Amino acid sequence: MQDYKRAVIIGSKQTFGKGTVQNVIPLDNIVRGNDHGDLGAIKLTTQKFYRINGGSTQLEGVKSDIVVPDRYSYIDLGERDQQNPLGWDKITPADYKVWDGYIDFDEAVKSSKERMAKNEQIRLIEENAKWLKEQQDENLISLNYDAYVSKEKEAKKRSEKFKSLRDYDSRLTFSSLQYEQELFTQDSVLREKRDRWHKDLARDIYVEEAVNVLKDLHKNNIKKKENELASVKG
């Protein structure tokens, strides 16, 4: 979608980049006469995926067009943070054409970046992410009781600042598809699940920005059609 310019990717710096095919090999099939019980299994990489532009998704993943922080932006989580990960490489690109259905695609991306840079909620998420990284890197624990308690109180006080992240309200409203709404009369559990999901979506600033980007692209697409009609009439 990104290579064809049919989508704007919004999110962290990159996806985890798991661009491989793996097979699970039971070790019991290899070791004969095993008296030690289940030996478990290992995963072997047998194939790799490539994008139409020739690049692998392994290690580098898909880089976002609009980078926004999340709580774990600075935490080492992916395979790229481990020892000896399978490297990124590139092959000959496929023969493809970029979709030209949007006008001012880059302008929509630029507008989103400007909104994100000014958003106080995003700044707070970034601050929270850096604080979590500090907590992860902290490897000294005082054996003095008073010093330890003081440090814990300080951390708790600082964490209070980030509780407001859970209270964010985009004021977006969501509704289930018609067929699900019909099921609600018979399935109250499904209704409760959807209600919780919709509330979570309303608190999600990334969903809110995705809607804003879609609005920009929609407006720009309308402009394109108006320009085409004007040129035909002219």
Map each language-model feature to its residues.
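Terminal low-complexity/disordered tails
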Residues: 232-234
